[in-house]
């Protein structure tokens, strides 16, 4: 399905302590900042949308880190969506594309939404990223009634007993995930890192993931997430779980 990407300046959803141009004036290893976002709207059915979002960028030596978080929303009352496709492009000030990344997820139930977050890296080539273009979509045939399919709603994987342990390279996030659905499932357990925007509201901007496999209906399993993203200057964190 073709998508039309519409660039949009960030307002209350994201915080920018200083313009990217001002950040670039600092020594290269020191720049960091929340950056712009564009969204995509599909044209058929009630298309998947991005309900909320956040992103962050920083440099460590010759490596650029791009982190992102988005709440994917399915407003269809009678159609679940299989294999939602997230596409991300990092763009320069002149509009040229520096780097792209994408991710396929599992089901989004009817009239439901959930958060997903992650990060990717690339080698710095002297061009400072000025913004992010973000899209979410699905193929026409992946809009399907959920009857007879093992589709979980966002609240059916319950995360409890969460804690942050250790420090430095030994930092880890632990807890339990319970499958409250009628189906055996695998889960992506995601720690969402949040930063405050200009209004003081905390917005997810990054995530690290653990995979918990073969969770039977009613079963609870432990998890441990290691912060491989390296993001450390977040204001708070939260852990969620989604079907995979």
Regions found by a protein language model. Name each.
Residues 1-5, 9-10:
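Positively charged n-region of N-terminal signal peptides that target proteins for export
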Residues 10, 14-18:
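Hydrophobic core
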Residues 18-31:
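Sec-dependent signal peptide cleavage junction
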Residues 28-34, 122-164, 205, 229-244:
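Terminal connector regions
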Residues 62-70, 167-174:
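Short, solvent-exposed loop/turn segments enriched in Ser/Thr/Gly
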Residues 72-78, 177-183:
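Asparagine-centered strand-capping/turn motif at beta-strand->loop junctions
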Residues 79-86, 99-101, 185-191, 204-205:
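Short, hydrophobic/aromatic beta-strand segments
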Residues 97-126, 204-230:
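Intrinsically disordered, low-complexity Pro/Gly/Ser/Thr-rich segments with frequent PxxP/GP/PP motifs
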């Amino acid at each position: 399905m073709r998508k039309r990407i519409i660039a949009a300046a960030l307002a209350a959803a994201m915080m920018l302590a200083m313009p990217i141009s001002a950040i670039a004036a600092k020594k290269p290893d020191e720049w960091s900042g929340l950056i712009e976002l564009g969204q995509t709207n599909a044209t058929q059915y009630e298309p998947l949308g991005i309900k909320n979002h956040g992103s962050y960028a920083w440099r460590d030596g010759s490596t650029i880190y791009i982190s992102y978080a988005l709440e994917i929303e399915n407003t269809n009352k009678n159609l679940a969506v299989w294999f939602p496709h997230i596409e991300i492009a990092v763009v320069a000030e002149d509009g040229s594309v520096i780097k792209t990344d994408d991710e396929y997820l599992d089901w989004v139930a009817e009239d439901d939404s959930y958060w997903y977050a992650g990060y990717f890296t690339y080698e710095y080539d002297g061009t400072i990223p000025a913004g992010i273009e973000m899209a979410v979509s699905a193929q026409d045939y992946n809009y399907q009634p959920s009857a007879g399919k093992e589709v979980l709603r966002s609240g059916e994987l319950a995360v409890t007993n969460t804690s942050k342990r250790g420090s430095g390279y030994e930092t880890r996030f632990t807890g339990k995930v319970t499958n409250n659905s009628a189906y055996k499932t695998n889960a992506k357990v995601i720690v969402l890192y949040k930063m405050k925007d200009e209004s003081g509201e905390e917005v997810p901007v990054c995530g690290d993931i653990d995979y918990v496999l073969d969770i039977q209906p009613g079963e609870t399993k432990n998890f441990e997430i290691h912060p491989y993203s390296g993001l450390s200057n977040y204001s708070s964190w939260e852990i969620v779980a989604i079907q995979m």
